[in-house]
A protein has these predicted regions:
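Alpha-helical segment of the N-proximal tetratricopeptide repeat
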Residues: 37-66, 70, 114-133, 137, ...
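Residue-level recognition of tetratricopeptide repeat
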Residues: 40, 74, 145-146, 179, ...
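Canonical positions in the second alpha-helix
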Residues: 66-67, 101-105, 137-138, 171-172, ...
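Canonical tetratricopeptide repeat
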Residues: 80, 151-152, 185, 219, ...
Length: 495
């Protein structure tokens, strides 16, 4: 299923065999103990893990909630609900409350479980150094636990360290060849590094292991779409829905595919159908943003403004800070009036500074990309004072959080500013750290062209022409690639 919309709580599914056993597994087995006072709670937990393994998130969360009702001190069940990742099914306030319950129960569980709670809590609250320390300690204590090995690999992947995650997933697959979840993530990692041959081979193994589940078909469809094979992707999305008509993420995938194909009215109709079956207000807002991006693809910026403002208004009513801030940030990205763009970015930052039940790391990461946008806009408009001041603010945020996502935002911002200053070699060093962002890759093309490196410029231009991920950044770059002559509708990012 799409990594951008659904959460990675399936990481805990790897431990379902462990949790079905005794309350605490022997330390000498190298397996993480599990503590709960309720056998029915454990059964619900295990059932939820199986559902998460197959990415049936809302149903899994129902099981976890029932487990917590039976045992409020069930630390791992609580920390699962709070796990800070790309989670469209759990509202921010619920994550915070679940994390607090997990920490309140720490004194009643094993040392290993305490380390897992510390690891995920510190990560969620933006304290990356102690998070890594807890992760390393628990992985060292339980080297045979495939749950922890899997969780570590997914956590690294979530930090945007794809090349580091690949060997971790490969090791997990080698140790447990019949265990499906690592194959899913490994295939995505291969696809994101443009190794589609390995991605397709790995995904075929995943489908073979789970022939009656929707998610393998959904994941295969997304990777086909990433490779530009849109019609084949639609076939597999529909195969997923045939297996489970309620697997709404495949409906979302159909919408994303039509958006990338250029059929924006059809995409909006498909997004509306997905939104109709969304399981949370967060999903409604996030998918509303995706639908609004279709107007950017059509260069109907008035339509985009209206759609983004509608999402921002609804998100504000529902106390969803990140989608509201994203809506303002997205609007800023295509404005031709620099003052208007900066005003929208100021609104986005103000939303994030308000009091919300929001994990600290989530707030920091969204703030980082808002600041990144401000640096790029100011640098492009020749406002070097604002660009430098904002870049300093972003650098301090990266240094204080040790958050890889924030660091990548800083490198993207620094690279953009340096390109505008004509410091191309220095810019390329920073931009290479943000090479999963089409806008940064586009800046790299400019830098290579300016330095006379036509081979690298052409290689990256070809990469951008085949960049098939349904993001705003991709839409902006695609508009530049396909509409160079439409000066009146040019975004400042499309240059």
């Amino acid at each position: 299923m799409p990594r951008n919309y659904f959460f990675r709580l399936a990481v805990f599914a790897v431990c379902c065999g462990v949790f079905a056993a005794a309350e605490t597994a022997p330390r000498e087995q190298g397996i993480l103990p599990i503590t709960t006072k309720s056998a029915p709670a454990r059964q619900l937990f295990v059932g939820g893990l199986v559902k998460l393994q197959n990415l049936h998130g809302p149903e899994a969360l129902q099981d976890f909630h029932k487990a917590i009702q039976l045992d409020p001190d069930f630390a791992l069940a609580n920390i699962m609900i709070s796990f800070e990742s790309v989670d469209a099914a759990v509202d921010p306030a619920e994550k915070v409350a679940a994390r607090e319950r997990a920490n309140a129960a720490k004194s009643k569980v094993s040392r290993g479980e305490q380390l897992v709670v510390d690891w995920l809590t510190n990560s969620s609250e933006g304290r990356m150094v102690p998070a890594i320390q807890s992760m390393n300690e628990v992985l060292e204590q339980y080297p045979k636990d495939k749950f922890l090995a899997w969780l570590g690999a997914v956590w690294v992947e979530n930090q945007q360290q794809i090349t580091r995650a690949i060997p971790m997933f490969e090791r997990e697959v080698a140790l447990n060849p019949d265990f499906a979840p690592p194959l899913n993530e490994l295939a995505y990692c291969y696809a994101r590094t443009r190794n589609f041959d390995k991605a397709f081979t790995t995904m075929q193994r995943y489908i073979t292991l789970l022939p009656n589940e929707s998610n393998p078909q959904d994941s295969y469809a997304e990777i086909l779409r990433m490779a530009g094979r849109f019609d084949e992707a639609l076939v597999h999305y529909r195969a997923s829905l045939k297996i489970d008509p309620g697997f709404v993420y495949s409906q979302l995938g159909i919408a994303d595919t039509y958006a990338l194909k250029g059929d924006e009215p059809r995409a909006r109709a498909e997004y509306a159908l997905a939104i109709l079956h969304a399981s949370s207000k967060t999903e409604v807002a996030t998918w509303g943003l995706q639908s609004a991006i279709t107007y950017v693809r059509e260069q109907d910026f008035a339509g985009a403004d209206a759609a983004f403002r509608a999402v921002a208004s609804q998100a504000h009513e529902n106390d969803l800070a990140v989608p509201e801030a994203e809506a303002y940030r997205f609007m800023a990205s295509y404005q031709t009036d620099g003052a208007k763009a900066l005003d929208l970015l100021k609104k986005a930052e103000a939303v994030l500074q308000e009091k919300h039940s929001l994990p600290k790391s989530t707030q920091q990461q969204e703030l980082a990309v808002v600041l990144r946008e401000r640096v790029a806009r100011a640098a492009h408009d020749g406002n070097n004072e604002l660009a430098n001041a904002t870049l300093k603010q972003l650098h301090e945020l990266a240094d204080s959080t040790h958050n890889q996502v924030v660091q990548i935002a800083y490198d993207g911002a620094a690279g953009a500013a340096l390109v505008e200053q004509g410091k191309y070699d220095e810019a390329l060093t920073h931009l290479a750290e943000d090479n999963r962002n089409p806008i940064s890759v586009n800046f790299m093309v400019r830098a290579y062209q300016k330095t006379g490196d036509k081979a690298h410029a052409d290689e990256l231009s070809q990469l951008l022409a085949n960049w098939n991920e349904p993001t705003l950044e991709q839409a902006l770059v695609a508009a530049e690639l396909h509409a160079h002559t439409n000066e009146s509708a040019r975004s400042f990012m499309r240059m």
